[in-house]
Amino acid sequence: PIIEFTRALVPEGKNIHAFERDGAKPTVTKVANHNELHEHITAKVAALQTEQHNTIAIICKSAAESAAAYEELSSIEDIKLVKSTSAEYEQGIVVIPAYLAKGIEFDAVIIYDASKDVYSNESVRRLFYTACTRAMHELHLYCVGEVSPFVLGADSDSFELITTP
């Protein structure tokens, strides 16, 4: 299900040959504000840990967004911030900018804010695609406000849209 979803994120996606990953259909959760975003991500991380996912990445667009997200999510036990100066990648729960996640795979990936405000410029489409394809088994996208147009280009059957009350 993840590959089907991510192929639709880039124009040449149908030509991409990737290994199929087992796992659930990706979810896209719309939240009203950043407080709600942090509550939902904290709860999702706890659920993923219960499901025995050993590597969980919260992927952000930039290093600045990663640092801010790390501060807001610091209540999550053993969470780590990966920076360009990090000596090596550590397993567990990490907050990481998308450009540093390239080449690394995680059991579960949470896209920190896949909103139109963050991911709508064509220049970041490949970065968004790269972030989403880091997931081996579970992919969860969260949006504060409107969903990224990149997501809206995917077949609505390829993901589950969740709108919080």
What are these regions (language model features)?
Residues P1-N33, A63:
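Conserved coupling/interface region of RecA-like P-loop/ASCE motor cores
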Residues T27, P149-F150:
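Short secondary-structure boundary/hinge segments and terminal tails
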Residues E20, N35, E39, A46-H140, ...:
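Core RecA-like ATPase module of SF1/SF2 helicases and allied nucleic-acid translocases
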Residues I3, T42-A43:
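Short, hydrophobic alpha-helix immediately C-terminal to the catalytic nucleophile
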